[in-house]
A protein has these predicted regions:
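Alpha/beta-hydrolase fold catalytic core
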Residues: 1-5, 21, 28-32, 223-230
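C-terminal catalytic-base region of ester-bond hydrolases, centering on the histidine
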Residues: 136-230
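Short, functional N-terminal and low-complexity linear motifs
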Residues: 17-25, 177-184
Length: 230
């Protein structure tokens, strides 16, 4: 009999494990065994936090039990680093929520103004330099297009700059969730990618995001039939 996967939920920058609690409870209601992994997003870099996740698993997880991973924002980049650095674990399926796989324009502005606000996370993650996703990993990407949050101030400024150039991007390229551009969430190696009407933080409490995350973990793809009703 195949062992049931454990779902590890990984929060983003300036957050703690508790922020993933509602999503975890919704996955638990669907029968998933979950754990909310907490880490120091400001003080430590992505590789240190990946190593600590590995240490936690060595103490609390049996290597024969498959692992599914769900990461919000920076948490998704930790997933990418972790699955590359620690291939010994049986990784099932991964879902990233609002993760800037191609780097973050918003984080770049903040880094130039006040580096301490993004800390070590910018240097080896939010600048777009995370290791490529291994080919065997099944990854689903959820992006949001509701521009709510403090990060929208930087992105609105950036959009105005882009509109003044001769090579103005399409309206689709200007969509963001208040912190991360939809375009920044796209990664060629992803198995599936969807855009939902949610903001960067709002996606963590959104029922549709939870339902789509659950569906991907179960089927290896998102439920595109449900997207027609949004």
């Amino acid at each position: 009999m195949q062992q049931k996967s454990r779902v590890i939920l990984i929060h983003g920058l300036h957050q703690t494990a508790w922020i993933m609690r509602l999503l975890a409870k919704r996955l638990q209601a669907a029968g998933f065994d979950t754990h909310q992994y907490g880490y120091r997003s400001m003080r430590d870099g992505i590789k240190t936090n990946s190593a600590r996740l590995n240490d936690w698993l060595e103490k609390h997880h049996h290597p024969d039990q498959p692992i599914d991973l769900v990461g919000h924002s920076l948490g998704g980049l930790i997933i990418r680093d972790f699955v590359t650095q620690y291939p010994k674990w049986q990784i099932g399926r991964c879902v990233t929520l609002g993760t800037p796989h191609l780097g973050s324009v918003c984080a770049d502005y903040i880094w130039r103004l006040t580096p301490a606000v993004v800390g070590r996370s910018y240097v080896d993650a939010l600048d777009g330099t995370v290791a490529p996703l291994p080919e065997h990993i099944t990854l689903g990407v959820i992006a949001g297009n509701r521009p709510y949050g403090l990060g929208q101030l930087f992105l609105q400024y950036h959009n105005r700059k882009l509109r003044k150039t001769n090579n103005m991007p399409s309206a689709e390229h200007l969509l963001h969730d208040g912190t991360v551009y939809v375009e920044e969430t796209k990664i060629e190696a992803a198995t599936d990618h969807i855009v939902l009407p949610v903001s960067h933080t709002g996606m963590l409490v959104d029922k549709t995001v939870a339902a789509q995350t659950k569906y991907f973990l179960q089927h290896g793809q998102f439920d595109h039939s449900e997207l027609k009703h949004l």
